[in-house]
């Protein structure tokens, strides 16, 4: 009896170990090699598979080397920001595959194929290969299928253009405060001085999202912004170890810190949402900020079709992060580029004077700023907030003339596409807002070659919000100052989820 029990136990253990070894080999070797063979058979070129790590190590080595050297102001930023994808593009052409660990990732640069990926939202879904990436915020940007459709339907009213116009006074108040601080700094030095505008722009855009989303000030939401900024840095560091199975669950110092920061954000937001819900019940809650509009839209849903409190908090986290991050980087690169191109700075300032005169900027006037719109589009083309978007395929499907197997990912390289001379001409790396003088459709030849906010059904819901806020900020800045590059400025764009200035943005501000 004892022998038979021991034998059974050993057999079970061996079976479990064998099954685990087989699953591991399947994941680390057999499936990747099968997918690689499938792709190469169709004529797709790409890198050979390195077990487990794929191309991650090579990618990060090249990125570290690129970041060690700053750029000239006139340089294309691609070699510093996306050196590995750029090298792959030069080596393999416009469609190729690389490896995110054991997962093949097919990069496509053909506008028709990009359009197809954006349009087929149920076939090309958000990947979930790096769970830590959602610790900052899940929300609408990370959902798929019916959940994405439901959240989009509920959130849409908050970003209706008429609702956003009502938020313009809040834009004005937040922007005016930071411009006033810069004015004081310059006045204290005489009529001009060096200002690192990056911290001020971060503070300004954070204050805007606090006021417009939650009816509060930056100081009340400051802790959330601090924690999300810390999380962004930790996630970028953790990304280097993404190929280690189960890494996100290991109790490392950085993982523990990420989870603690995420819990603290959750507690703060739960307090904000619960306080607003109690105020609504008492008939005292404002309904003109994003949270108020969102709650109202959610309540209008039929029983069971609304969002849970947890869902609401995830959307609030996304409001905080995306709402602040996208506009702050758009503004900092706009100021850097206008410092370099004084002719466009003068044209933008003249337009602001013509439209507003001595009046304060309002929604109607901001929408008349054609030159400013051209400038912002060109900044978004050269410095898109994120450098690429990724989609996952879970079943075999066609993309153009390719047949793609389930289990691969698609990379849409925003930066490379928007800098591509084949799509944008020989001056693709140069700052030339005139390319947008006849509108987006003419500039892109009606192709999907400009997608800083994504495209199609999943286009960024906050696009109009970000652009109107940026116009308000630039209108106030241009009326008060002229500005140029400081000798101490180091041109070093780098990615912390979005493209940041690595060493700040030091400009010489002249009071007008």
Swiss-Prot record:
Main localization (coarse): membrane
Entry GO CC: cytosol; membrane
Alphabetical list of InterPro entries matching this protein: Cyt_P450 (IPR001128), Cyt_P450_E_grp-I (IPR002401), Cyt_P450_sf (IPR036396), Cytochrome_P450_Monooxygen (IPR050665)
Keyword Oxidoreductase: yes
Location relative to the cell: Membrane
A molecular function (GO) term: heme binding
Organism from which the protein derives: Arabidopsis thaliana (Mouse-ear cress)
TM segment ranges: 2-22
Protein name: Cytochrome P450 72A15
Binding site for heme: 460
Keyword list, A-Z: Heme, Iron, Membrane, Metal-binding, Monooxygenase, Oxidoreductase, Transmembrane, Transmembrane helix
